[in-house]
A protein has these predicted regions:
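Conserved catalytic core of two-metal-ion nucleotidyltransferases
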Residues: 2-49, 148
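Long, acidic, intrinsically disordered low-complexity segments
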Residues: 43-64
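Conserved nucleotidyltransferase catalytic core and NTase-mimicking acidic/glycine-rich helix/loop elements
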Residues: 56, 64-193
């Protein structure tokens, strides 16, 4: 409670909940977003002897969403998100969290790999011949780049949107310089896309 209060004081928005396993089972049975949130949960405080039991209980909750149902629901969710961000406005000023190719797509892929294939780390995909090492390196580099941009943007703006103003800001923070051929913002957005 004190930790969350401290974060709020710092104006950090953080998703959080305090729930029993029974609460989690009830909520996640029919709510995809709630279920997905438990695929990437982070424990702030837990007694060591309770952790194996917690993981076992969460595995039971996980079994309520079969692989096909989960995959199809995530695909539908992604298609709906793509439709809502399919406009000239969002093509010119993408949202670092929700626009196609941004954080939510990386997260969706990770959630599908974890739930449907029991893969905890991208590197495990190499052992299963799902991806090459080069592909994993490229994905990790892109994911880190988008997360880094969002982090910097969130330090200066209360938005995930790469508005023209924010593009200028991030181009400047990236120390890009304009040239005769292209402006710093054009260079920044070329790297982004």
């Amino acid at each position: 409670k004190d930790f969350i209060g401290w974060l709020w004081t710092l104006k950090v928005k953080v998703g959080h909940s305090v729930r029993t396993i029974k609460d989690i089972e009830k909520i996640t049975k029919s709510d995809l977003k709630e279920f997905t949130s438990y695929l990437s949960y982070r424990i702030i405080f837990c007694k060591k002897n309770k952790l194996p039991s917690l993981n076992s209980d969460l595995d039971k909750v996980s079994n309520k969403w079969n692989k096909d149902k989960f995959f199809n629901a995530k695909k539908l969710e992604q298609n709906n998100r793509f439709k809502s961000f399919d406009s000239t406005e969002f093509n010119l000023e993408p949202d670092l969290k929700e626009s196609p190719g941004c954080l939510r797509d990386f997260q969706t892929a990770l959630w599908i790999l974890e739930h449907c294939f029991k893969i905890k780390k991208l590197e495990d995909c190499i052992k299963l011949n799902l991806f090459t090492r080069e592909e994993i390196v490229s994905v990790n580099k892109s994911y880190a780049h988008i997360k880094g941009l969002r982090y910097i943007l969130n330090l200066y703006s209360n938005s995930n949107r790469l508005s023209f103003e924010n593009q200028l800001l991030l181009a400047k923070k990236s120390k890009l310089k304009s040239s005769k051929k292209s402006s710093a913002v054009e260079k920044f957005m070329r790297v982004f896309f």
